[in-house]
UniProtKB/Swiss-Prot annotation:
A motif ('HIGH' region) lies at residues 58-68. Catalyzes the attachment of isoleucine to tRNA(Ile). As IleRS can inadvertently accommodate and process structurally similar amino acids such as valine, to avoid such errors it has two additional distinct tRNA(Ile)-dependent editing activities. One activity is designated as 'pretransfer' editing and involves the hydrolysis of activated Val-AMP. The other activity is designated 'posttransfer' editing and involves deacylation of mischarged Val-tRNA(Ile). Zn(2+) binds at residues 906, 909, 926, 929. It is an enzyme of class 6 (ligase). This is Isoleucine--tRNA ligase. Belongs to the class-I aminoacyl-tRNA synthetase family. IleS type 1 subfamily. Its main location: cytoplasm. L-isoleucyl-5'-AMP binds at residue 567. IleRS has two distinct active sites: one for aminoacylation and one for editing. The misactivated valine is translocated from the active site to the editing site, which sterically excludes the correctly activated isoleucine. The single editing site contains two valyl binding pockets, one specific for each substrate (Val-AMP or Val-tRNA(Ile)). It comes from Pseudomonas aeruginosa (strain UCBPP-PA14).
C-alpha cells in the first residue's frame, strides 16, 4: 500500500503538549520583566479611561498563605481583564508595616527591654525583610504590578501623609480625647480596634450577688408597702466577679416588672419573669409580695457588698430578661453600656473607679484584692461575697467571649484616656461622621450585594473610633497638650504639618526624638508632648489619602477615589470600615466606588484550614508541583462570594480542566501550520457555512465573557471557556473539520476557510484566558501566526470576530438543530461500537429517517452531511419509510439506522467508499482523494 502521508496537511506545532508549568513559568516572569511589561502598559494607557483597584495591604509578617493567593489572584484577574477591555488599570501593591505583631516579634527575638528607638529600628528592618519574601511569592503567582515601587505604610512619605490625614480630621473637629471603655489586651498592653477582636469559647464563673438596701423606706414605697420587716437585697448576676470591686451602680429596665420576693430571711428584688428560675438556682423557697415597674426603683440606693459606698439604681434600656436576674451591676470603667449610663446620670470622669492596671493587675491600694491578677482574683472575690452573706449562687458556664486576635487571650473593656474619632460629634461643617458614612454606603456598589447591609449595620451601631495606642512601632499622634488645661495646642494643625515635613525626611523617629522646644520655643514648658501611636487600621485606612492622591497618583481627576476595593469578607469591619471613615471625614465621600468581598478558604469538607487538622494547602507547594496557572484556574473556577473550597483533589480537577483547555489551544495552533494571516485569511462571505458559524459562536461567547469579566463572575468565564473547548469545539466543530483540514488541498478554499476560523478563534481564546491563565496565554501568544505585540497583555479584546447574519440559510438556529441531530447520531454510533457492530465512526453508514421539515433542513447540506456526522455515508429518507429496526432518537421526528459499510476503506481519508479501487494508479484511494491530490481539488460549501 502506498504511503500517502506526504499528501496530507497534518497538524504541526512546537507548542508543547506537556505544560511543564513549574519550569516554564519563571521564564515568562523573566520575559515580562525584560520587556518592562508593566511600564509599557502605563506608557500606552495615557489616552485610555482609568480603572483603579486599590490594593488592601497585607501585613508584613510571615509567609503568604492560600488566602493571600486567592486575594492577589482575584485582583490580578481584574486588572488584566480591565487592561484587555481597553482601560489603563495600574496596580500598586502595598504592605501594612506598623503594629503590635511586628513589635511583638522583635521583642520575642531581642527582648522586651530594648530602648524604644532600637525597637523601631529593628521593627523597620524586620518588616522590610518580610516584604521581600512576600513580594517574591506574589510575583511568582503571576501578579502584574508596580513591584519595583510598592507602597509601604512605613515609608517616610506615607508616615508623613498619615499625620497630614489626621491633621485634616483634627481641623474638621472630629478628634477628641476622652475616657472610655475600650477593648484592652493585657498582653498587648494596649487598646484594640474592633477588627482586632475575635470570639472564642471561655469557661467563666457566674455569680448571683445581693446588694443590701440602704434606702429601705424608698424601696418599700416603690413596691407600695408601708415598710420592710426584714433585710432586703437587690440581686445581680454576672460572669465577671472581678468587676464587683469597681461596681458603682445597678441598672434596671424602666418597663420591666420587678418583684419583691419574700425568701425567708430576707427580701430579694428580682425581675418578675425570672423569679422562678432564680429561686431554683438559689435553692430557696419564695413568694412574690409586691411588684413595681423598673422606673419606680430609680435612684434608690443600695450598699456595696464589701466596700463602704452606695450603688444607686439607674435606668437602662439594654437590660434584658434572657439570663440572670433582670438587674445588671454597673462598673463604668469596665463596660461600655455601664459607662454611658453612669455618664448620663452625671458621673464625672474623676468619679469613675478604675482599679485594674494595664497589665490586668489590681492597684496595690485596692482593699482585699490589691496586687492580684483579675482572672486569679475571681475566686477570691467569690469567697469575699460568701463571707459577707451576699453570694446567692455560684456556677460556671461556657460562653463566647472576646479574645485578642494575636495572643488568643481574653480581653476586657477598660476605661482609659484615649484619642477618639467621634462618630456623632458635630464637625465644624456638615454632617456627623456616622451620617456621612451611612450616606456614602448608599452610593457604593457591593459585590455581593449583602455586603451593603453588613457594613451599614456595623457603621450604624459602632462606638467612637479609638485611634490611639500605647506602643512604640507606629505612626505618632503628634500632639502637644497644655499641662494645666489638658487642651490641644491652639496651633496643632500647623504644628502637625511641621512634624510631617520632618517625618518625610527622617521617618517617625523624627517625632520621638523631637524636643518640644524645637517647635514650641518658650511655650514648651507649658505643654506635654504625647507619645501615643495611631491604630494600625488608621495606617491602612488612610492609604487612599497617600497612594491615590500622593505617592503614586493613580486616582481619578475627580479626587482620590478607587474604582474597587477587594478583600476578604472580614474587612467589612477592617479595611473597608476604616477607609470609609477616614474618606468621609476628610473628603466627605467613600474612597471607593465598589466593594468586592470574597470568602475564606476551607477544605473540601467545609472545615477551616488548620495545621492541626493537616488540611492546609501551601501555595508555594502547589506552584512547585502543578504551576501557578493551576492555582489561578482554581481561583477563577470558584464562586468566591462564599467559602472557597480547596484540597489536593480539587486542585487536581483544575489541572485536568487546564489540560483540556491547553490541548484545545494546541490543536488550534497545530492546524494553523503554514497559515499566513496576511495572505491566507478569507473574508466571512468566502468562508464555508460551518466555519462562519464557529466564528459567530466565538463572537457570542466573547460578549458573554466580557460581561462576566465586567461583573467579576470569573467562575462563569471559566465554565464558558471550558465548555466551549469541550462541547462546541472538541465535541463538534474540531472533529468535523479534521477531514477537510487534513485531506483537501493545502491552499484550497476549503482548508483556508477552516484555518481562518481557527485563527479567529485562537486570537479570541488566547485573550479570554489571559487574565486567568496568565502564563499559558503568554506562551500561546508567541506561537500564533502573524505580526503582533510583544505580549498578549499589550492587546485588547479581539475585534476580528464576525457575526453570522440572521437571514442566511444556514443560520444559528440551523446549526443548533444540526448539533442536536449529530448528538443523536453519536449516541447510536456509541451503542453500535459497544455492540461490536461497527469499529470506528467511518466504518458506519447512517440513514436518517426524518419528518418532512427536518429532512428538508438536513438536505441543505447535500452530500456534505456525512462530513458533519463523520460517517462514510449519510442518507436521508422519509420518517414514514423507517424500518422496524430503526431506533428512536431524542430529536423529535427522527429515527436512525446505522450499518457497517461493505465498501473498501480509503488509505488516505479512511472513509469507506464505493469508488475505492477504481483508479489504476491509486487503487487504495477514493475518488475524492484522487481529486485532491491530482485534480483541482474537491469543492466544499458547507462543512
Amino acid at each position: 500500500m502506498t504511503d500517502y502521508k506526504a499528501t496530507l496537511n497534518l497538524p504541526e506545532t512546537a507548542f508543547p503538549m506537556k505544560a511543564g508549568l513549574p519550569q516554564r513559568e519563571p521564564e515568562t516572569l523573566k520575559f515580562w520583566n525584560d520587556i518592562g511589561l508593566y511600564q509599557k502598559l502605563r506608557a500606552i494607557g495615557g489616552d485610555r479611561p482609568k480603572f483603579v483597584l486599590h490594593d488592601g495591604p497585607p501585613y508584613a509578617n510571615g509567609s503568604i498563605h492560600i488566602g493571600h493567593a486567592v486575594n492577589k489572584i482575584l485582583k490580578d484577574i481584574i486588572v488584566r481583564s480591565k487592561t484587555l477591555a481597553g482601560y489603563d488599570a495600574p496596580y500598586v501593591p502595598g504592605w501594612d508595616c506598623h503594629g503590635l505583631p511586628i513589635e511583638h516579634k522583635v521583642e520575642t527575638t531581642h527582648g522586651k527591654n530594648l530602648p524604644a528607638d532600637k525597637t523601631r529600628e529593628l521593627c523597620r528592618e524586620y518588616a522590610a525583610e518580610q516584604i521581600e519574601g512576600q513580594k517574591a511569592d506574589f510575583i511568582r503567582l503571576g501578579v502584574l504590578g508596580e513591584w519595583d515601587n510598592p507602597y509601604k505604610t512605613m515609608n517616610f512619605a506615607n508616615e508623613a501623609n498619615e499625620i497630614r490625614a489626621l491633621a485634616e480630621m483634627v481641623k474638621q473637629d472630629f478628634v477628641f480625647k476622652g475616657l472610655k471603655p475600650v477593648n484592652w489586651c493585657f498582653d498587648c498592653g494596649s487598646a484594640l480596634a474592633e477588627a482586632e477582636v475575635e470570639y472564642a469559647d471561655k469557661k467563666s464563673p457566674t455569680i448571683d450577688v445581693g446588694f443590701p438596701v440602704a434606702d429601705a423606706d424608698k424601696l418599700a414605697a416603690a413596691f407600695g408597702l408601708a415598710a420592710l420587716d426584714k433585710p432586703a437585697q437587690i440581686v445581680i448576676w454576672t460572669t465577671t466577679p472581678w468587676t464587683i470591686p469597681a461596681n458603682q451602680a445597678l441598672n434596671v429596665h424602666p418597663e420591666i416588672d420587678y418583684a419583691l420576693v419574700d425568701a425567708g430571711d430576707r427580701y430579694l428584688v428580682l425581675a418578675e419573669a425570672l423569679v422562678e428560675s432564680c429561686l431554683a438556682r438559689y435553692q430557696r423557697e419564695g413568694k412574690v409580695v409586691a411588684t413595681a415597674k423598673g422606673e419606680a426603683l430609680e435612684l434608690i440606693n443600695f450598699r456595696h457588698p464589701f466596700y463602704e459606698r452606695l450603688s444607686p439604681v439607674y435606668l437602662a434600656d439594654y437590660v434584658a430578661l434572657d439570663a440572670g436576674t433582670g438587674i445588671v451591676h454597673s462598673s463604668p470603667a469596665y463596660g461600655e453600656d455601664d459607662f454611658y449610663t453612669c455618664k448620663r446620670y452625671g458621673m464625672s470622669n474623676d468619679d469613675i473607679l478604675s482599679p485594674v492596671q494595664s497589665n490586668g493587675v489590681y492597684v496595690d491600694s485596692l482593699p482585699f484584692f490589691g496586687g492580684q491578677f483579675i482572672w486569679k482574683a475571681n475566686p477570691n472575690v467569690v469567697a469575699k461575697l460568701e463571707e459577707v452573706g451576699s453570694l446567692l449562687a455560684h456556677e460556671t458556664i461556657n460562653h463566647s467571649y472576646m479574645h485578642c486576635w494575636r495572643h488568643k487571650t481574653p480581653l476586657i473593656y477598660r476605661a482609659t484616656a484615649q484619642w477618639f474619632v467621634g462618630m456623632d460629634k458635630q464637625p465644624r461643617q456638615g454632617a456627623s461622621l456616622r451620617e456621612r458614612a451611612l450616606e456614602a454606603i448608599t452610593q457604593t456598589e457591593f459585590v455581593p450585594g449583602w455586603g451593603q447591609a453588613r457594613l451599614h449595620g456595623m457603621i450604624a451601631g459602632r462606638p467612637d473610633w479609638c485611634i490611639s495606642r500605647q506602643r512604640n512601632w507606629g505612626v505618632p499622634i503628634p500632639f502637644f497638650l497644655h499641662k494645666a488645661s489638658g487642651e490641644l495646642h491652639p496651633r496643632t494643625v500647623e504644628l502637625m504639618e511641621e512634624v510631617a515635613q520632618r517625618v518625610e525626611k527622617e521617618g517617625i523617629e523624627a517625632w520621638f526624638k523631637l524636643d518640644a522646644a524645637e517647635l514650641l520655643g518658650e511655650e514648651a514648658a507649658q505643654y506635654d508632648k504625647i507619645n501615643d501611636t495611631l491604630d494600625v487600621w488608621f495606617d491602612s485606612g488612610t492609604t487612599h489619602w497617600h497612594v491615590l492622591r500622593g505617592s503614586h497618583r493613580i486616582g481619578h481627576a475627580s479626587g482620590p477615589v478607587a474604582d474597587l476595593y477587594l478583600e476578604g469578607s472580614d474587612q467589612h469591619r477592617g479595611w473597608f470600615h476604616s477607609s470609609l471613615l477616614t474618606g468621609c471625614a476628610i473628603d466627605n465621600h467613600a474612597p471607593y466606588r465598589q466593594l468586592l468581598t470574597h470568602g475564606f478558604t476551607v477544605d473540601e469538607s467545609g472545615r477551616k484550614m488548620s495545621k492541626s487538622l493537616g488540611n492546609t494547602v501551601v501555595p508555594q507547594t502547589v506552584i512547585d508541583t502543578l504551576g501557578a496557572d493551576i492555582l489561578r484556574l482554581w481561583v477563577a473556577s470558584t464562586d468566591y462570594s462564599g467559602e472557597i473550597a480547596v484540597s489536593q483533589q480539587i486542585l487536581q480537577r483544575s489541572a485536568d480542566a487546564y489540560r483540556r483547555i491547553r490541548n484545545t489551544t494546541r490543536f488550534l495552533l497545530s492546524n494553523l501550520n503554514g497559515f499566513d494571516a496576511a495572505t491566507d485569511l478569507l473574508p466571512p462571505q468566502e468562508m464555508l457555512a460551518l466555519d462562519r458559524w464557529a466564528v459567530d459562536r466565538a463572537l457570542l461567547l466573547q460578549r458573554e465573557i466580557e460581561e462576566a469579566y465586567r461583573e467579576y463572575r470569573f467562575w462563569n468565564v471559566y465554565s464558558k471557556v471550558h465548555n466551549f473547548c469541550v462541547q462546541e469545539l472538541g465535541g463538534f466543530y474540531l472533529d468535523i473539520i479534521k477531514d477537510r483540514q487534513y485531506t483537501t488541498g493545502a491552499n484550497s478554499v476549503a482548508r483556508r476557510s477552516c484555518q481562518t476560523a481557527l485563527f479567529h478563534i485562537a486570537e479570541a481564546l488566547v485573550r479570554w484566558i489571559a487574565p486567568i491563565l496568565a502564563f499559558t496565554a503568554e506562551e500561546v501568544w508567541k506561537f500564533l501566526p502573524g505580526e503582533r505585540a510583544e505580549s498578549v497583555m499589550l492587546a485588547t479584546w479581539y475585534d476580528g470576530l464576525s457575526e453570522l447574519p440572521a437571514d442566511v440559510t444556514l443560520n444559528r438556529q440551523y446549526w443548533e438543530q444540526v448539533m442536536a441531530v449529530k448528538a443523536a447520531v453519536n449516541k447510536e454510533l456509541e451503542n453500535q461500537r459497544a455492540a461490536k457492530a461497527v469499529g470506528g465512526n467511518l466504518q458506519a453508514e447512517v440513514t436518517l429517517y426524518a419528518e418532512d421539515a427536518l429532512q428538508a433542513q438536513l438536505a441543505k447540506l447535500g452530500n456534505e452531511l456525512r462530513f458533519v456526522l463523520i460517517t462514510s455515508t449519510a442518507t436521508l429518507a422519509p420518517l414514514s419509510a423507517a424500518p422496524a429496526d430503526a431506533v428512536d432518537s431524542e430529536v423529535a421526528g427522527l429515527k436512525l439506522k446505522v450499518v457497517k459499510s461493505t465498501h473498501a476503506k480509503c488509505g488516505r481519508c479512511w472513509h469507506h467508499r464505493e469508488d475505492v479501487g477504481q483508479h489504476a494508479a491509486h487503487p487504495d484511494l477514493c475518488g475524492r482523494c484522487i481529486e485532491n491530490i491530482e485534480g483541482s481539488g474537491e469543492v466544499r460549501h458547507y462543512a
